[in-house]
């Protein structure tokens, strides 16, 4: 099995708790490559809860650096820091962020993550990720932002979101996913053909 998780990376450090500066965090996917990587993943997740909890469990780059051995990291979805910077037009900042993660995890253990759930933002970001990968030599990986197993589970997932957020299904202003493409897709369905 592939064991991993998506973590929240604190805006500053995992110890900072200023509502104006630290409520926002970015996603990062961590996968255990080895037994040592699994142990490091457990340490990272444990410390995110015991040391970094502020609205949600958070990690920071010092914690990642301290426990990076045996871990593969992916830049995550649109909520990843690299993608977030690209969305606001900060290509140089995205490049620095990606190179920083490569420095933490190693040349072949950090990947830029391409996703295509049919979102307009992905259509804008993906070509920039490809460009960034070519310029930096950081490898690319095509994935899907999986929140449920099968496409037909989208409605059940929507109901669970309503329960989680104390909303009604008929509330037009509630949190919802934009479409039903957030399921576990086959390798063929995920293949990114725009390289």
Describe each model-derived feature in a short phrase.
Residues 1-195:
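Phosphodiester-processing cores and adjacent nucleic acid-binding clamps
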